[in-house]
């Protein structure tokens, strides 16, 4: 299948109308059905085990893992959800999508950035991609693939090093590889929606880290104010386990609900053995605030279990060391332990929408804040019964760590606001 045909298939799916089967996830079929579809293919993608980690912790919030020993990045992947099927599917899909991103297409175009610009080729706006430093790329030819700008409907060239994943050997100069925006789904549209939400979440988290302590304190949310039964169950499990839950509203001017959840022992300040792994966080984003909050809470639980299982290849030894109460960590602990009043979440009007309508809503909000491109690169695979894409949105921020990270105007304006 040609790259042009792949983009046509993606564009066609984005014009369809398909709804999720549950109030709690955007999938055309249930997580159990998705897992049943991909299970026969797991070994072909090098995935040797998928299992549950939930019982290793006291929270009883479903968390799963998938193992792929010969990965070019991490060899263990995590998944979370509101039930076991969702967690298992989440872990397996993450392992699958990462493997797919390791396979470079045979028809990559080799060209320098300068030659692309000289020929006025339609390309992604590298000057505003957070994980790219154009001045550091150099004058050597680099590989390019084709993506679809869903705002204009046009094909654009994208450097493969912004799309694929390979952490072996030397990293390509000028690019900070990451899994941000790499997503999968039962259909291309499902995958695009998941990738978009993740990028808006990363932007919100990056800006949250730049806010003043006063602004953060004002952002604390009472989980009970959502009035959702599943959030109430999760909160009750955390409390019964002797833990505290901090929920911060990270929603930016984009207007798509985004939250940070932090779980820590209720007696952390009294413990002489307090460690970094005792304070675990997670983020979530979705136009439906309940889904956004649940993603944050379940990801915080996933962070705890990942530390307990010791299953991340890229863990720093520091995570198991005594908590030294650095300024940033002290701030988080104080927010968790503070007795100040939490504000109720003011729900924005949210109506049930199809997956494609939800993508359109997010795209409209991004355009309203100055975003000019939303680029999607599909990863077609003949044997795979699900879809994998990479979504890239020039102009959105990412966590400010890495050699080739560009600080954008959204971050600059947040810093100015914190200083004023």
Swiss-Prot record:
Gene3D superfamilies: 3.30.160.660. InterPro entries: YcaO-like_dom. Residues 79-420 form the YcaO domain. PANTHER family: RIBOSOMAL PROTEIN S12 METHYLTHIOTRANSFERASE ACCESSORY FACTOR YCAO. This is Uncharacterized protein in tfuA 3'region. It comes from Rhizobium leguminosarum bv. trifolii.
């Amino acid at each position: 299948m040609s790259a042009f045909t792949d983009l046509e298939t993606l564009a066609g799916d984005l014009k369809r109308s398909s709804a999720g089967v549950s109030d709690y996830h955007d999938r055309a079929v249930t997580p159990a059905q998705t897992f049943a579809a991909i299970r026969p293919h797991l070994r072909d993608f090098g995935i040797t085990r998928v299992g549950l980690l939930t019982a290793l912790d006291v929270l009883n919030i479903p968390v799963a893992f998938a193992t792929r020993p010969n990965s070019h990045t991490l060899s263990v992947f995590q998944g979370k959800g509101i039930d076991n099927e969702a967690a298992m599917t989440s872990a397996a899909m993450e392992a699958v999508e990462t493997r797919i991103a390791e396979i470079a297409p045979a028809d990559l175009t080799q060209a320098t950035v300068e030659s692309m610009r000289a020929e006025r080729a339609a390309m992604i706006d590298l000057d505003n991609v957070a994980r790219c430093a154009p001045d550091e790329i150099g004058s050597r030819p680099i590989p390019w693939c084709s993506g679809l700008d869903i705002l204009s409907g046009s094909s654009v060239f994208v450097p493969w090093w912004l799309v694929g994943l390979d952490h072996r050997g030397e990293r390509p100069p000028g690019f900070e590889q990451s899994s941000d925006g790499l997503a999968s789904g039962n259909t291309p549209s499902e995958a695009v929606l998941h990738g978009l939400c993740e990028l808006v979440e990363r932007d919100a988290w990056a800006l949250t880290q730049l806010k003043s302590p006063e602004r953060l304190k004002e952002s604390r949310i009472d989980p009970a104010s959502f009035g959702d039964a599943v959030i109430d169950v999760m909160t009750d499990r955390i409390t019964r386990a002797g833990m505290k839950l901090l929920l911060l509203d990270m929603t930016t001017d984009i207007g798509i609900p985004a939250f940070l959840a932090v779980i820590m022992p209720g007696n952390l300040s009294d413990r002489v053995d307090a460690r970094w792994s005792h304070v675990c966080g997670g983020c979530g984003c979705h136009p439906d605030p309940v889904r956004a909050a649940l993603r944050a809470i379940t990801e915080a639980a996933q962070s705890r279990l990942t530390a307990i299982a010791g299953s991340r290849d890229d863990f720093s030894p520091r995570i198991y060391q005594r908590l030294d109460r650095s300024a940033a960590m002290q701030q988080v602990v104080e927010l968790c332990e503070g007795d100040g009043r939490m504000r109720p979440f003011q729900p924005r009007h949210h109506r049930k929408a199809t997956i494609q309508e939800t993508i359109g809503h997010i795209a409209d909000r991004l355009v309203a804040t100055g975003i000019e491109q939303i680029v999607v690169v599909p990863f077609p695979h003949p044997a795979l019964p699900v879809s994998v894409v990479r979504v890239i949105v020039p102009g959105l921020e990412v966590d400010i760590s890495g050699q080739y990270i560009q600080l954008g105007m959204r971050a600059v304006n947040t810093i100015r606001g914190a200083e004023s």
